[in-house]
Amino acid sequence: MGSLRILGVDPGYGIVGIGIIEVSGNRISHVFHGTIETPKNLPAEKRLKRIYEEFLKVLERFSPDECAMEKLFFVKNVTTAIGVGEARGVLFLALAEKNIPVFEYAPNEVKVSLSGYGRASKKQIQENVKRFLNLSEIPRPDDAADALAIAWCHALQSRARRVTHEKD
């Protein structure tokens, strides 16, 4: 079996977390992590355009096979939810243009896959990302670490789906 390049995305309006890993057999390795940031003083349409254009550059540079994105699960602030929803829209558009399938995960699913516990702390998840990917330090900012965690979750979930499918 060949390798699988997974793009993890922690969607946001101000900061989009990006994490890319490669799965080859039983080995999962770190490829890249970073963020796409938009200044608060830019109008909404320019912020969304920047997210879209920068995200397309990531897709073209790293050619992921699949994308794992955090679901918009629960937010306390409606304004924040609207901005994140708009950002998700342009991210989905870019992924659709490149024919990259998207898999969505709730935050507690990501936590369970990295810690075995759906209410693990952010710090615990970040430490596990560092350890599992053999990184010298926790990826910064938090959004990038979260994106790597989402990618890791998908790697485990897709492996489980393949094993289940092979048994059928």
Swiss-Prot record:
It is found in: Cytoplasm. Its EC number is 3.1.21.10. It catalyses: Endonucleolytic cleavage at a junction such as a reciprocal single-stranded crossover between two homologous DNA duplexes (Holliday junction). Its cofactor is Mg(2+). Gene3D superfamilies: Ribonuclease H-like superfamily/Ribonuclease H (3.30.420.10). InterPro entries: RNaseH-like_sf, RNaseH_sf, X-over_junc_endoDNase_Mg_BS, X-over_junc_endoDNase_RuvC. It comes from the Bacteria. GO terms for cellular component: cytoplasm; Holliday junction resolvase complex. One of its GO terms (molecular function) is crossover junction DNA endonuclease activity. The active site is at D10, E70, D143. Mg(2+) 1 binds at D10, D143. Mg(2+) 2 binds at E70. GO terms for biological process: DNA recombination; DNA repair. Binds 2 Mg(2+) ion per subunit. Keywords: Cytoplasm, DNA damage, DNA recombination, DNA repair, DNA-binding, Endonuclease, Hydrolase, Magnesium, Metal-binding, Nuclease. It holds the Pfam family RuvC. Belongs to the RuvC family. The RuvA-RuvB-RuvC complex processes Holliday junction (HJ) DNA during genetic recombination and DNA repair. Endonuclease that resolves HJ intermediates. Cleaves cruciform DNA by making single-stranded nicks across the HJ at symmetrical positions within the homologous arms, yielding a 5'-phosphate and a 3'-hydroxyl group; requires a central core of homology in the junction. The consensus cleavage sequence is 5'-(A/T)TT(C/G)-3'. Cleavage occurs on the 3'-side of the TT dinucleotide at the point of strand exchange. Homodimer which binds Holliday junction (HJ) DNA. The HJ becomes 2-fold symmetrical on binding to RuvC with unstacked arms; it has a different conformation from HJ DNA in complex with RuvA. In the full resolvosome a probable DNA-RuvA(4)-RuvB(12)-RuvC(2) complex forms which resolves the HJ. This is Crossover junction endodeoxyribonuclease RuvC. It comes from Thermotoga maritima (strain ATCC 43589 / DSM 3109 / JCM 10099 / NBRC 100826 / MSB8).
